[in-house]
Amino acid sequence: MTGDGDSTPMKSYLRRLSVRSNLTAEEQEAILALPGETLSTAAHRDIVRPGQLTTFSCLVVDGLAARFDQLSNGHRQISALHIVGDFCDLHSLAVPEAGWGIQSLTPTVVRLVPHDALRKIISAYPNVAMAFWRDTVVDNSVLAKWLSALGRRDATARFAHLICEMGLRYEHVQLGTRERFAFPITQMQLADVLGMSSVHINRVLQALRGQGVLETRGQVFHILDRRRIEKLADFDDAYLLERKNRTS
């Protein structure tokens, strides 16, 4: 773990915020100047453990992380995916004791931003506080969509909805487009997220390929027919609060 005063780790987060919040130049500079330590971890390592009392929030700088719930028997369920530019647990500023865990799914780099620094910036800049709040609303909206997908969508729609969502999220932080993006997740991890077996995931993927809707090359997902996959998924991006959907 090393200290890092460079603003670069915060740039992707600023891009994410700017999708749905108007920030002044001064506010942007304050966000870029947030201090923190950089932690590099191998895949499948816990970054925050359930029940841990935290004094920081984790920003993903590189890789892919997941928030998870852990049962008393040790079994885990992924409840959120966090890409570059995501704060995994900005809400820990209000509730420091983790009721969840955060794990790296790939080799991952995170920025540990002290809660004290976050408190100072939201005290000094109320508009930044509102941007942070809006950001946590998006996290909750994503979770709500995942829950409805698990309960009410068939396997193909569930898979298609996640792919549509991830394309937009990678586009927001300028790491791809909504049609083409690198998504470093395994079929087993997808199975956990979507409540299916890895065999079922493979069947759905093959079916979408066969229909000419989706192409994959390694970790790169290429949506060949955006309109069709959105129809399959019944996808409406309003829950991601893009700027076009905002009134203020």
Walk through the language-model features, giving the residues of each:
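ATP/adenylate-binding site constellation spanning eukaryotic-like Ser/Thr protein kinases
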Residues: 62, 84, 107, 115, ...
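Cyclic nucleotide-binding regulatory module and flanking cytosolic helices
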Residues: 1-43, 87, 92-94
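Cyclic-nucleotide recognition modules
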Residues: 80-141, 145
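Short loop/turn motifs at secondary-structure junctions and domain boundaries
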Residues: 30-31, 48-51, 175
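Polybasic "coupling" helices that flank or enter modular domains
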Residues: 127-195
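Short aromatic/basic micro-patch
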Residues: 38, 81, 112, 184, ...
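Phosphate-/nucleic-acid-contacting segments
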Residues: 169-248
